[in-house]
């Protein structure tokens, strides 16, 4: 789309955590438009559907059909992806266009801007300048702090466990190409296949008050994890036993921003709309942001500040709804009614009735980054 971009990454190497993510049709639509959809699909898994299951009985409700149904309904697949594979595909795409366009070991410390340029100061004492600065620097965004001041992250009261399970470690009947949300009082478990069914991604979320480490790399033990989900269905226990090394982290929230941009600087992704991972839209929203921003920079006439304002206007309400929808799912997945067998059945049947599911997901999946008005 005609933008000459330099990427400054503080990590010394491009290495993603070993975890999965879900890319619904609104995300894969952008990746196909960028020409990397098929490359990623070849490394991923196209689940046939998603299910809701009760935490202790395993009783099941359909969440929605995927696979060919997603392609037929939305024009693009719903992929479950190993995060390092997505990073590799995107990195190769950038380097095909600009071999030296990614600068590793380059941590941004501060920036200044004037009417003509913006200058980024790096931790090695050097600085670089350009027409615009895009802060895609995550939940601890330096760019956000400089633009809008410090804001303290708040603990949501939820910890999450993650792990990657080799599919061969699971009983054969569990090696299914579906995604499952196990819902229970005060917690839930999500799992889905990765890498053409060779791996299973596991995430378990639990309401707790005694763990506030935000790092993704805090190791736990399978014994701790099993204790946290004691009494849950045997299939959940089987997955926990099969995880080689589980990790845990605290889910933190930051106040939403009423605006993202100032003159030549703007934000993207978690830097401006971090969300709890209960709508499977965090990565997708960042992909959408990037595509819409590129369109704004190349399609909108006028000064740069106007281009960034139009990008922000196109994205603010949608990302706000995604943040709120993710938070709403905490109560939906963890509802106290799920503790009682009879109430749980009625509750799940009502909450995941077809019209309710459609109201929560159709507006997400049908969004088209190539056509949205900017």
Explain the meaning of each model-derived region.
Residues 24-166, 209-226, 364-374:
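Conserved N-terminal helical subregion
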Residues 348-374:
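C-terminal auxiliary extensions adjacent to catalytic cores
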Residues 6, 101, 201-203:
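A structural signal for isolated positions on well-ordered beta-strands in alpha/beta enzyme cores
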